[in-house]
Amino acid sequence: MQVLQLWLTTLISLVVAVQGLHFDIAASTDPEQVCIRDFVTEGQLVVADIHSDGSVGDGQKLNLFVRDSVGNEYRRKRDFAGDVRVAFTAPSSTAFDVCFENQAQYRGRSLSRAIELDIESGAEARDWNKISANEKLKPIEVELRRVEEITDEIVDELTYLKNREERLRDTNESTNRRVRNFSILVIIVLSSLGVWQVNYLKNYFKTKHII
């Protein structure tokens, strides 16, 4: 148990220490989407803060799309610059993508936008300042509660992965049984067909007085 607590504490420290992403997206007249993928569990709050340099009308149109792997779209914003915040609650455990598309309005110009992306989910996405004010919590109480919620989320994630592994193993075993049963059925059918062909040829030769 102490080992698990130490592991969780270390993982929490790594999660908290993660900073936002910084990258550039070159403008193109035929742009391809650049996507950042993350995973979220059912019921988790997700908050994505996006900042782009430049300005609208600077010769490039930066488009934003936020959607998950099951087809839900949470935000679509075209030709934006500056700050955008996207918040949603995941309806199911799935991966989601934050995608950017930078379209150049003119050919022959080398343009790009610098993007800053910060994605937080679960306990990290909650407004702890507001919670502290509403519930009149001390700073240490807020921090302990935040760490507790992060720990619960990690335990839930580990439980989900364990259950998923069990489902995949059951599916694999079921598939193996079906393949084995199908192979046995094929052998029986082929053997029966062989016996029938032998009897048919034997009767045919007898009627022709060949044997």
Swiss-Prot record:
Domain of life, source organism: Eukaryota
Subcellular location: Endoplasmic reticulum membrane; Golgi apparatus membrane
Cytoplasmic compartment residues: 202-211
Gene Ontology CC, one term: COPII-coated ER to Golgi transport vesicle
Leader peptide range in chain numbering: 1-20
TM segment ranges: 181-201
Keywords, in A-Z order: Endoplasmic reticulum, ER-Golgi transport, Golgi apparatus, Membrane, Protein transport, Signal, Transmembrane, Transmembrane helix, Transport
Domain GOLD span(s) in chain numbering: 33-121
Membrane topology, as annotated: Single-pass type I membrane protein
BP GO terms, sorted: endoplasmic reticulum to Golgi vesicle-mediated transport; Golgi organization; intracellular protein transport; vesicle budding from membrane
Matching InterPro entries: Emp24-like, GOLD_dom
Membrane topology (Lumenal): 21-180
Major place of residence: endoplasmic reticulum
PANTHER family: TRANSMEMBRANE EMP24 DOMAIN-CONTAINING PROTEIN (PTHR22811)
Sequence similarity: Belongs to the EMP24/GP25L family.
UniProt subunit comment: Associates with EMP24, ERP1 and ERP2.
Function statement: Constituent of COPII-coated endoplasmic reticulum-derived transport vesicles. Required for efficient transport of a subset of secretory proteins to the Golgi. Possesses a C-terminal dilysine motif that interacts with COPI coat subunits. Facilitates retrograde transport from the Golgi to the endoplasmic reticulum.
Extra information: Present with 51700 molecules/cell in log phase SD medium.
Name of this chain's protein: Endoplasmic reticulum vesicle protein 25
